[in-house]
């Protein structure tokens, strides 16, 4: 049996769609009563150990989508709880959606590396999908204003962005053949790096890219009503891209998909 956690999230929902025709898959979510799903659903709450121990019973392969929305200690506690429960329940293999290695400069990298280490120290089989940042995230971070300006502190930096749907496709392919990917770490970044100027050109001649400073971005984000932990996360993301740490491309995604990855610009503008 396959179980997918976080099935109501943006990535999890795409994965659930792709597994809908299988009779060996169940979906996990914190609020199953609010989830209309094409597959059986179990209550899986990373903050509630009992739901994990019960929900993971009978599971052979666990696709563990990162519960990364929170402070580092919160995320590590959630992931550690899930790994311990999976091991206790007799899960044979865990596929974990992590963060690209080039993201080590990002403020939210530490819980991912901690989780990878915990998985590797467990008695279960494991596969780590080091996902690149979504093209859709870049589009949100650098969205045009009503007057046609993209204002973001990206400088000349570029991001090897990935279409979220490609990461969903890759996760499904690995999960349904987990044994063939045991002990593997995949760097799932894009094959083309894009920046603010590329986004502006893709929007058309009426849109211009105007870099701002990190301080300006911090003030703007702080005034937007973002959660306190979100502001340094987003500013750190801008900083890493601008500094050129997120532009390295790779071919693991194409290898898993068996096709060319989708254009990050097309995904960003969709």
Give a label for each model feature.
Residues 2-27, 31-32, 47-49, 57-60, ...:
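Oxidoreductase cofactor-interface core, primarily capturing Rossmann-like NAD(P)-dependent enzymes
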Residues 164, 196, 214, 263-264:
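Structural motif detector for alpha-helix initiation sites
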Residues 191, 236-240, 270:
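Short acidic/histidine-centered micro-motifs embedded in hydrophobic/aromatic stretches
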Residues 148, 244-245:
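Short glycine-centered helix-capping/turn motifs at secondary-structure transition points
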Residues 36-48:
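Rossmann-fold cofactor-recognition segment
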Residues 31-39, 54:
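Short loop/helix-cap segments at secondary-structure boundaries that form the rim of catalytic
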Residues 252, 257-270:
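Amphipathic terminal alpha-helices
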Residues 186, 200-244:
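Terminal hydrophobic/aromatic helix or amphipathic segment near a protein terminus
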């Amino acid at each position: 049996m396959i179980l997918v956690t976080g099935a109501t999230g943006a990535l999890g929902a795409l994965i659930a769609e792709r597994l809908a025709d299988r009779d060996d898959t169940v979906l996990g979510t914190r609020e199953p009563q609010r989830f209309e799903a094409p597959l059986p659903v179990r209550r899986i709450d990373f903050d509630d150990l009992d739901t994990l121990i019960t929900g993971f019973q009978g599971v052979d392969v666990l696709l563990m989508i990162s519960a990364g929305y929170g402070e580092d200690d919160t995320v590590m506690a959630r992931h550690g709880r899930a790994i311990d429960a999976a091991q206790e329940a007799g899960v044979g293999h865990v596929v974990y959606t992590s963060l690209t290695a080039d993201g080590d400069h990002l403020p939210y990298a530490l819980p991912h590396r901690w989780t990878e280490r915990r998985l590797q120290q467990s008695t279960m089989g494991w596969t780590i999908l080091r996902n690149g940042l979504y093209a859709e995230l870049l589009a949100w971070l650098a969205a045009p204003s009503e007057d046609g300006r993209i204002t973001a502190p990206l400088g000349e930096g570029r991001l090897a962005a990935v279409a979220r749907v490609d990461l969903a496709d890759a996760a499904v392919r690995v999960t349904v053949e987990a044994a063939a990917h045991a002990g593997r770490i995949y760097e799932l970044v894009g094959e083309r790096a894009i920046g603010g100027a590329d986004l502006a050109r893709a929007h058309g001649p009426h849109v211009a890219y105007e870099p701002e400073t990190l301080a300006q971005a911090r003030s703007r984000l702080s005034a937007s009503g973002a959660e306190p932990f979100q502001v340094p996360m987003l500013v750190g993301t801008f900083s890493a891209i601008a500094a050129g740490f997120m532009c390295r491309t790779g071919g693991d995604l194409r290898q898993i998909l068996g096709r060319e990855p989708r254009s990050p610009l097309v995904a960003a503008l969709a």
